[in-house]
Regions:
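Conserved nucleotide-sugar donor-binding catalytic segment
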Residues: 1-85
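C-terminal subregions of glycosyltransferases and related glycan-biosynthesis enzymes
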Residues: 50, 57, 62-135
Length: 135
């Protein structure tokens, strides 16, 4: 099970380096999404994370539940899809925006996005080990 922060403050801090929500179980008010500018495909493969950062920036109150709401299997190709030059480039562009938007510091960018980019270009077998350790 992927552990995510529960409180609003912890979610905000965690979101500076990693996505603070488990995607399939997210619920939100339509008005909160609209206030943040809606769903945009600006950062390929990071569309949801991009929306959630913008929602947090507009003051949207967020909370995770401690309960497991959904069990998911990891498809065999997931670790391959989370790597490569295109994924790394998109991830770096997204995290650079997070920094430029004022949500994070340059230190957060350097200690979050840069190591993540190394994981992206690592061989799939190494990436799988790292993802399993983090989740």
């Amino acid at each position: 099970n992927r552990e995510v922060p529960l409180s609003y403050n912890d979610i905000g801090e965690f979101s500076k380096k990693r996505c603070p929500f488990n995607h399939p179980c997210v619920m939100f008010k339509k008005t909160a999404v609209e206030k943040a500018g809606g769903y945009k495909e600006t950062y390929h493969l990071f569309e949801d994370y991009y929306l959630w950062i913008r929602m947090l920036q507009t003051g949207c109150q967020a909370q995770n539940l401690p309960d497991v709401l959904l069990y998911m299997r990891t498809p065999n190709d997931m670790y391959k899809r989370r790597g490569g030059k295109e994924y790394a480039t998109s991830m770096l562009r997204f995290h650079w925006w997070v920094y430029k938007s004022g949500w994070t510091s340059l230190l957060d960018f350097c200690t979050g996005a840069l190591p993540h980019s190394l994981v992206c270009v690592a061989p799939t077998t190494i990436r799988k080990i790292i993802y399993k350790a983090l989740h």
